[in-house]
Curated annotation (Swiss-Prot):
The chain crosses the membrane at residues 39-59, 71-91, 93-113. It is a multi-pass membrane protein. The lineage of its organism: Viruses, Riboviria, Orthornavirae, Pisuviricota, Pisoniviricetes. Keywords: Host membrane, Membrane, Transmembrane, Transmembrane helix. This is Non-structural protein 3d.
Length: 227
């Protein structure tokens, strides 16, 4: 039986080609680890990033520091998603990569438009740092103060002596209020003072929406006032 020497010639097979099948066009280009990621990997990245962004919106911290941390995480995740999407679209031609990029860009455009609109209404860049969507703006002629609110209620309590607790973000210290405005994503209302009350030597003023109709007023005054 005759044997040909060609049967014993060695053939070099690159690891990338063995574990990562490539098309004829891709074979002419240098191997890239991104080409070896299956489409399921892109789908998992898209779903995971979408869920993370939704969880950030559902999570509603009560403190100012918690909202700042939430904003930092949101912008960091958005930047990561943008870089990941662009990187995948440039190095691959998968439909899911383009879908991820479109999702992130759309999300960023809508969020930026919403924050710009709120910033213009509030007259401050605070909406870009604090992700809440309800604010109280107080003007005294010379200066103004913007306070983010955890709730969408119109009620606002002014307390001259009680220290500001960041958990509430309702207390502002001034004795010459000229205008008090409640601003949210959907409405803007002028608040007027209706009554004063004293608790433990601390004088407070209750503000409610300006209205021609009767406004229900319920005041509970514990040692620490919460609205």
């Amino acid at each position: 039986m005759a044997f040909s020497a060609s049967l014993f010639r060695t053939k070099t097979v690159h690891t990338e080609d063995a574990f990562c099948p490539r098309s004829a066009i891709q074979a002419e280009q240098p191997p890239n680890i991104i080409d070896c990621i299956p489409v399921a990997g892109y789908e998992a990245a898209l779903i995971t990033n979408a869920l993370f962004l939704l969880v950030l919106f559902v999570f509603n911290p009560l403190t100012c520091k918690g909202n700042w941390i939430k904003a930092i995480l949101f912008y960091s995740l958005l930047l990561y998603n943008m870089i990941l999407a662009i990187f995948l679209v440039v190095d691959t031609q998968h439909f899911v990569s383009a879908l991820l990029l479109a999702y992130v860009v759309t999300f960023l455009v809508l969020w930026t438009a919403d924050r710009i609109r709120l910033s213009c209404a509030v007259g401050s860049v605070l909406p870009f740092v604090d992700m809440r969507s309800s604010y109280i703006r107080v003007d005294n002629g010379n200066s103004s103060v913007v306070v983010p609110m955890n709730h969408t209620k119109h009620w606002f309590i002014r307390n001259f002596e009680q220290s500001c607790h960041c958990e509430n973000c309702f207390y502002i210290h001034s004795s010459s209020y000229v205008e008090c405005t409640f601003i949210s994503r959907l409405k803007k209302s002028i608040l007027v003072s209706v009554c004063d009350f004293s608790l433990g030597g601390n004088v407070s003023t209750v503000f409610v929406p300006s209205s021609d109709k009767t406004v229900p007023l319920h005041i509970i005054a514990p040692s620490k006032l919460y609205v």
